[in-house]
Amino acid sequence: MCFEPIEETTFHSLLFKDAKICHKCFLKFKPKINKFNIGNVKGLYLYNYDEQVQNTLYQFKGCFDYELAGVFFDYFRLYLFLKYFGYVMVPAPSAKEADEERGFNHVVEMFKSLKLKMNCCVHKTTNVKQSDLSAKERENIKNNLKIDDVDFSKKKVLIVDDVYTTGSTVRAMIDLVKSKNPKKIKVLVMSKTKDIHEGV
């Protein structure tokens, strides 16, 4: 981040008046809206999980820099709000101990900037961090998740997460949400690793 004052007379400053970073810094994330599929569920991601995104995300959730909560969505906010208007966001849970240490749930705070309804109904049953698990162990993440007794019938649900790597968390969440009979399910992730094949 350049930390330079944002020019208030530019086109971008007028169109994105609530942006926390300038357009030049935003472009360093190399934004690109890409579609992918998880089974028969449609997903969308905004960035490849490259070094710039990784470092900024670490500064936000690892260094507790709360002011960075909305920077990934600043210039996508209106588009995403209109695209997913009427959906209820269900954020991926993180370890309770990690949330308590940083003072906030990073996924919740990140996606809160979209101004869509949110239901934090999926929880981890253990405090194991996914980053500490092997790829094989991550595939069994569904055994560490549970969903509240919610009724999603006639509702459209948007599952949201920060990074899509193996996809195990998202797939487990899809199964949990499906058990609550939603009208439709879609997935939105901030970033996605390159080594995951589309459609899996």
Locations of the language-model features?
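Glycine-rich phosphate/pyrophosphate-handling loop used in enzymes and phosphotransfer proteins
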Residues: 1-200
